[in-house]
Amino acid sequence: MLRCLALTVLLSCMSFAWCADRPYLVTNSAAAEEDEEQVWSVENWYRSAGAQRSLTVAPEYAFDPLNSLQVEFRRTLDREGVNGHELEVEYKHLFNHIARDGYGWGVVAALDMVRPQGGPWTRSAVSLALPFSLQVAEGSGLLHLNLGVSKPRDERRVFTGALAAEREVFRRTTLFAEWARDEDGRLLHGGVRYWIKRETLAVDLAWQRVRSDDSRGSGVVLGIAWYDL
């Protein structure tokens, strides 16, 4: 009984823990990176929102510009709830090249698992999303739209949606923002990405606000990412 209660609380803390492409928290990009051929990347970020804290490490392997596999390992801490771990496996396939067509679209499938502190690993949800990306501002910016559906364990399906935008404003500096919503809550997130070494090493500084039926709060998001490893 206690394990079931702990799992329920941890699942409620997972609002907007959908699969995503950095620097976003929810949104997937459908912009194919033409130089990503059999390369690794590692993205890491820390999130703070109200009583909740989390640290994520996410290695990704790009088979080619159109196909990639990412695994996210996340440690969650909640001063008012249950601590635990989360694991997400995500496969993304893109159907075209944005550099050629000016737009891109694809499909993302993900499996989520959780382990409350002291409990076993349990499947928490499966999801499917359709990302669409559009080049704007003569190629210096991107607009993203995601529509999807998630099936939490022992619950009804939840439809999800996200909008995001990014644009390079200075050399090596990109501003980004995203808005997401499902039937239980909303997310607002925005910040700046700075490339220490262009296309190889980046740091992110952002702010987020989360509002759901179970909790609400705001806080910082700090990230660092290595690409083309």
Describe each PLM feature range.
Residues M1-A6:
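Bacterial N-terminal signal peptides that target proteins for export
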Residues T8-L10:
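N-terminal membrane-targeting/anchoring regions of envelope/secretory proteins
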Residues W18-L229:
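Transmembrane beta-barrel domains of Gram-negative outer membranes and organellar outer membranes
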